[in-house]
């Protein structure tokens, strides 16, 4: 087929405002998501220059990174956190931006509340001053993180200069086996191509295993596209997408809905479209995954062992492995199921949606958190929290000894009062296991919600495909 285009190319082409020869094209931004950490300087820049927002109705703000998951009171925040949330509130008031503050029933992690409110739509360009903006690509949107200076530029112009990325197709063929989740799929992908395997690319995830995922699962996969170095991750919209969006607050209604769906159905990669790179995996080969090191690419199956750097031919990779093992406090050859933990975190923009909490609750129900283990469950938004409580999931967790918290980014990053102490070893459903990510000297192992809950009750990592 001549002129065949990929999903990314179609969305990109539809948003070019100007493409001066020899310069980066200018693209239009449909939705701009804002939070308290990366926006203060951007708003200050506008005030200094005397500029207004170009499109305040296309800008949506929430408080998530620094908020407390124990209390909705400003008094629960550190002085710096309080300054940031109060500054965001004032900036939103001054510039006419819709804000979901800590008292709003829909407040939550920006990448959880955006989709559930229908702010995220197929074929749109979405930006946010946050690296995990790729999450929204699950809807067939082109979504990526931007820096604070770019946040200011989008606020002022609703556009952005961007170089076009290369295209990569990651096809996960066939179907996963029981116990294998979207988190396991994306960790397996990162383990295969490495944390820089997607650098310079926008990745389209496809194949039967991806198509079979719910929207929550697709968001988990796209969320971690950045962890393989990609600019963004995308999944073509389909009936699963449309069913999820129907009736949501900011989704089209009535005749506009029918017209939108007709357009969205055309936003898919054409037959014969050429990708710059192709990666293929067999879903049946993917087992529950567990990171052993200090980046998401240092990952193995739960029935595996901590790898031995001596078997790595590349000197640079070998040195990285040795450094990771020293920090993480593990010995090569240790079975993954022999690794004990003392902390569990179920939450983050990767895995804090209702499907994630249901999955974790299956392993918590009728059990008790192991002695010496502290486990917290942090729903991704007010909507998720309310739905989970309506389903009785909170009671399952609380009766098992988990702490049930308020929405927020929480222990994903050591930016609020939920953090690990030096030497703590945590089973975490978040997206990064870097040195110190969850607190100075903390040791993080990335897993699915089901694996995290199972580790909480066992006191060590277990293969959830087997009795434990």
UniProtKB/Swiss-Prot annotation:
Reactions accelerated catalytically: (2R,3S)-3-isopropylmalate = (2S)-2-isopropylmalate
Q: Which SUPFAM superfamilies match?
A: Aconitase iron-sulfur domain
Q: What does the cofactor field's note say?
A: Binds 1 [4Fe-4S] cluster per subunit.
One Pfam family in the UniProt entry: Aconitase
| Enzyme Commission number(s) from the entry | 4.2.1.33
Q: Which cofactor does it need?
A: [4Fe-4S] cluster
Mind telling me which PROSITE patterns this protein's record contains? ACONITASE_1, ACONITASE_2
Q: Which UniProt keywords apply?
A: 4Fe-4S, Amino-acid biosynthesis, Branched-chain amino acid biosynthesis, Iron, Iron-sulfur, Leucine biosynthesis, Lyase, Metal-binding
Involved pathway(s): Amino-acid biosynthesis; L-leucine biosynthesis; L-leucine from 3-methyl-2-oxobutanoate: step 2/4
> One GO molecular function term?
4 iron, 4 sulfur cluster binding
Task: Detail which positions bind [4Fe-4S] cluster.
Answer: 349, 409, 412
Task: State the family named in the UniProt similarity comment for this chain.
Answer: Belongs to the aconitase/IPM isomerase family. LeuC type 1 subfamily.
Q: What is known about its subunit structure?
A: Heterodimer of LeuC and LeuD.
What is the documented function of this protein? Answer: Catalyzes the isomerization between 2-isopropylmalate and 3-isopropylmalate, via the formation of 2-isopropylmaleate.
> Which NCBIfam families does the UniProt entry name for this protein?
leuC, PRK05478.1, PRK12466.1
Name this polypeptide is given: 3-isopropylmalate dehydratase large subunit
Q: From what organism does this protein derive?
A: Shewanella baltica (strain OS185)
